[in-house]
Structures are given as C-alpha cells and as structure tokens.
C-alpha cells in the first residue's frame, strides 16, 4: 500500500512497560538490535533521522495507553522531543480507555498533556450503529452477518451499552 511508502509504523499493542522497556520495545519494532541502555535512545534517534531523510514519517501507535506508567509516558514525551530543526521525528498516537484521560490529568504529566495537539473520545454507538458494527466485524471475520439474529445483535448492543469494546467481548463469548 500507499501508506507504507509514506509512513514507518511502530505499533505497541500492550504497553505494560517501564520507561527503559518501552525504549527497547520501540527499538525492536524499528529493527534496531541493541541491548545497551546507554545507546538505545541515540540509536533510535539516528534511525528516525534516516527515515526522515527519505521523506517518510514515523508514527508510534500505542494501544491500551491507559496501562502506561507515568515513567513510560515520560519516555514517550521524550521521544516526542526528538526533532530536526524543522520537523518532529516521530508522531505519537495513543489509544486508550477513559482512564487515560484521568492519568493524563495528573500534575506530574502536565508537560506531556501540553504536547497533545488532538484528542477525541468515542461516544457509545446507537442501536443501528451497533448492529452495523457487529455485521461489519462478522463480515471481516469471514463469518457473514447471519450468525446472530437482529434481535440478538440488539441484545448484544444493549448489554454492551453501545460500547464497541464490550460489543466485541460479548459477541466473542456468545
């Protein structure tokens, strides 16, 4: 695809890591094989500069970001400081539960919070959106949307209160 020619993607799906572990996880995802904690950040920076010089952007996506410790969030903030004279070398994208907002409101994370340029919260899905969401997930899984009746899909939506993560969990167990 087209996005791969413009972006180097780093994906951390389950970031229950301290600051140093996070540095090494990012390095591994970037293809950096080094276990020297004193060199790892400079090796990451060198890699990011090389990627930037080719015209590509590096994007670090962290899922379940509410699980990040304050130390790991500070490590991410420092990654966000890596830049050339004109450009940031890495974009950070955090996905998390509402607890992430609570964590980011902590006083010691104010510097991190000040660097957030865009924030978005998802509202619960309407019943029609919930049914369409379930249909889409089933289609993507190759199961077709006929596994559950419309009444069952609405019951799943109701039990999940329209929250996509809960819809996924309930559907998976059903």
Residue ranges: model-predicted function:
Residues 17-21, 33-75, 84-88, 125-130, ...:
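Mid-core helix/loop region of P-loop NTP-binding domains shared across ATPases and GTPases
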Residues 61, 96, 121:
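Conserved Rossmann-like nucleotide-binding pocket used by diverse enzymes
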Residues 2, 21-29, 43, 71, ...:
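Alpha-helical scaffold elements adjacent to nucleotide-binding pockets in ATP/GTP-utilizing enzyme cores
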Residues 32, 51-55, 82-84, 93, ...:
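Helix-loop-helix "sensor" segment of P-loop NTPases
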Residues 64, 94-99:
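A short beta-strand-to-loop transition that corresponds to the Sensor-1 phosphate-sensing loop
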Residues 4-9, 17-35:
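Conserved NTP-binding/hydrolysis module of P-loop NTPases
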